[in-house]
């Protein structure tokens, strides 16, 4: 029954669906995720407050006890679960991609499909099951997202490693995240979409030594991985440990590693530290061929209760475990953090061999058998390595770093501690979200640090006077709105980066982005700097970040004729606090809100629009009202008239929707991106883009447009636009949500 196609079920959710009839239609489902409808906790539940009541040290004590409390249903290798839990944490956080900010461990998504069933995550279902008694004990005070990562941290500590710290604060989600593009392949280990000459992979469940993945590319030394994915195969976290497509070539593997880890925001030193540090402990598992392994959790029968990959080889566990298909124990003390990994890497010469499952791996030449067995104390093994381990020796740059680490153990330990901390926290966002007694004091550049204002926050009367001063500068309100939007809309809900706080729009690289209209941006910033200077003559201070947002608020208020909320307290980042290379990934290729850019051969403009809206955590109604409002406010990045369908530009009217829904207007394509409209009744000519016309062509978006385009729609349109505007302006204000600022400071007279 579990394998029957959904469309054969004649109950709700079954049958042929819209996506079957029209697979290319614009999907809005990613704008309806992670809402109160799916969250079992009360609407007023605050995870941050619950975490603060957690017995943190008691939890860590319980986790340390678990490390050596081997369970019969899933015995611990070497009597210690450390290696398993390090892998669990690594594979939770390691899905992060800097290009779009998605993935990572911040939502606890390893519990859900597809991640819970990826070939690279075989046996991690058992790791989470081992954790359940502890999760059960502490309940809502610790999320799965936090617990999985903290467990990896505690595992390292219990094996003798000093970590850099840990921050909690990751609330759980309750459904599979549909917003992340993991690749276009439809088979496990396939990569024919992410690479132009890739392989189709295989449909069977199981481990990563699938035969289809070993056909190999003709261009493994030159191929380019599509953006924004970071893994070399569908269903892998990183790269194929046997080598590119199973070809045991350490140099070619290094190329894949460098691509993948750089897309995780890791440089070469961090990459070497993570691989060497992570492979210092634990082992891989490949006791027998993968045809012994049953279906993954999502395809397993109901009686398996969420567990997958049942193994018919021997006992199916312990010494008979099949996970990756590789059988490697790196060091002589796999439950202790040592320098053995790097020592052996350079001490021995390595020859290619096969695991019991038939996977490519390497064994030390002329070495004695001194590596312990995971379960039989009478057995010993020769040192073994993965192809990707040897990359750290045979890639010239990785080799330099690896040798330096070998010669400087304390440097290696510090590098691994920092890289591991970064891996676990890269998608956490601002430090104001970080919770717990182990938050490190040192500020790190990748945090995108923003100084906390060292002066009293402006009050209501200050806000009123500043708004008047801003509007008196003579800068067009549309330019003020464009600048405020440009600053705030860089926010990414995936990794909580970007946003108006910090005013990085005035710094490189954002001040050079075409979408930000650099010449106009400089004009607006100059005017606001003047307002700031005049205001501070009184002895008070205001951040330019606050002024940028306040300028937009003042302009929207003037256009709408109603008060617009404003929450002060932003700080100003410096260029030295800004990682230029990292921030380049926030530059939009297209921004429908400002009618900038266009689609590609694979992605339409409107698909990019929905993707951007999801990053801004917008609902479909919020997306609709913002686009319609920004058009009539003249927020197009280049001042074009596309979609500015109003006789009162600069006024917050519902004219965009009224005009769009006029049945007398017919449209013709100019180039597939821009369209010309003619009203047969008035003769009026219009122009619009795909980002405009989609609100009339897409049935669900049109339904929303009809609400705002109705005769009684103006009041609701204004109310909803102001609310959505305020939401975007404050997406990165986790400091306010956490009550770090005194509430009395925020009750400005607006």
Swiss-Prot record:
Signal peptide: none annotated. Coiled coil: none annotated. The record marks 87 as: Transition state stabilizer. Binds 1 heme b (iron(II)-protoporphyrin IX) group per monomer. Optimum pH is 6.0 for the catalase reaction. Residues 200-218 have a biased composition (Basic and acidic residues). Heme b binds at residue 279. The keyword Transferase does not apply. Formation of the three residue Trp-Tyr-Met cross-link is important for the catalase, but not the peroxidase activity of the enzyme. It catalyses: H2O2 + AH2 = A + 2 H2O; 2 H2O2 = O2 + 2 H2O. Its main location: cytoplasm. One of its GO terms (biological process) is hydrogen peroxide catabolic process. GO terms for molecular function: catalase activity; heme binding; metal ion binding. It is found in: Cytoplasm. InterPro entries: Catalase_peroxidase, Haem_peroxidase, Haem_peroxidase_sf, Peroxidases_AS, Peroxidases_heam-ligand_BS. The keyword DNA-binding does not apply. There is a cross-link at residues 238-264 (Tryptophyl-tyrosyl-methioninium (Tyr-Met) (with W-90)). Its cofactor is heme b. The active site is at 91 (proton acceptor). Keywords: Cytoplasm, Heme, Hydrogen peroxide, Iron, Metal-binding, Oxidoreductase, Peroxidase. It is an enzyme of class 1 (oxidoreductase). Bifunctional enzyme with both catalase and broad-spectrum peroxidase activity. Homodimer or homotetramer. Predominantly homodimeric. Belongs to the peroxidase family. Peroxidase/catalase subfamily. This is Catalase-peroxidase 1. It comes from Pyricularia oryzae (strain 70-15 / ATCC MYA-4617 / FGSC 8958). The lineage of its organism: Eukaryota, Fungi, Dikarya, Ascomycota, Pezizomycotina. The gene is katG1.
